[in-house]
Amino acid sequence: MSDNDQWLGAAVQRRGADVKATTKDGDTVFTCIIFLLGETVGGDKEEGRMINRFCFRVTQLLMAHGADPSECPAHESLTHICLKSFKLHFPLLRFLLESGASYNCSLHGPSCWSGFHIVFERLCSHLSSSEDDSFSADLLQKAETVLELMVASSQIPKLPSDFDINSTSCRFQGEKIKALFYSLKQLQHSPQALKHLCRVYIRQRLKPWPVDVKIKALPLPDRLKWYLLIDHGNSGEEDI
């Protein structure tokens, strides 16, 4: 997983390799990346960082050549995998969302799989089993950032028609999760505020990643920059 490997991949694509091709077994260009990300769980930390950097750079290259990380089936979707493990793969997920990847199935929409549903499902699952305050705070902060990234990528959030949560299953932080959920539902059913539409438009124009770095460089008042930014303390770039 050296720079030479990435150079070779870039050279192959420049010679016409099809990033949308699949093998006879149904493997896609993201199959190996998903496998490698799985190898980072519970392994050596330094090796995990090296794998994550490699997966990030290759994903960046593939998306630049038109690869879609949000196609179904879900187990072959890099976006779906990152959403399910949003705490672990947060930097890569942020890159995907800021680079135009759909937070729902890009072929069939939210009725197939939905980023909002996955995040709330994983949030409730993790917070039902952990009383660790620092873990809960970090998980909630990352979940809020992911939800905000998804909201800021479309004028109206695309939710499944039957989208709901069972807050009673969340033993800890249930009220905070309900507040997040209801604010999202309200955004879906209310007329969109002009400032939200402007935020979506500006962030779309600044894609791809890193959008927040580009916002900070704009000749705008600090108050406006603050509204445009997501996760004010971190652009995500330093985590790669």
Predicted ranges, named:
Residues 1, 28-31, 45, 61-62, ...:
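Cross-kingdom leucine-rich repeat
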Residues 1-4, 32-54, 80-89, 122-123:
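Ankyrin repeat A-helix N-terminal signature
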Residues 10-18, 56-68, 94-102, 151-155:
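Ankyrin repeat domain, specifically the short helix-to-loop turn at the C-terminus of the second helix
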Residues 15, 23, 36-37, 41-49, ...:
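Solenoidal tandem-repeat scaffolds enriched in leucines and small polar residues
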Residues 23, 73, 107-109:
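Ankyrin repeat boundary/linker residues
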Residues 26, 75-76, 112:
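Start-of-repeat signature of ankyrin repeats
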Residues 49, 81-240:
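Cullin-RING E3 adaptor/co-adaptor recruitment helices
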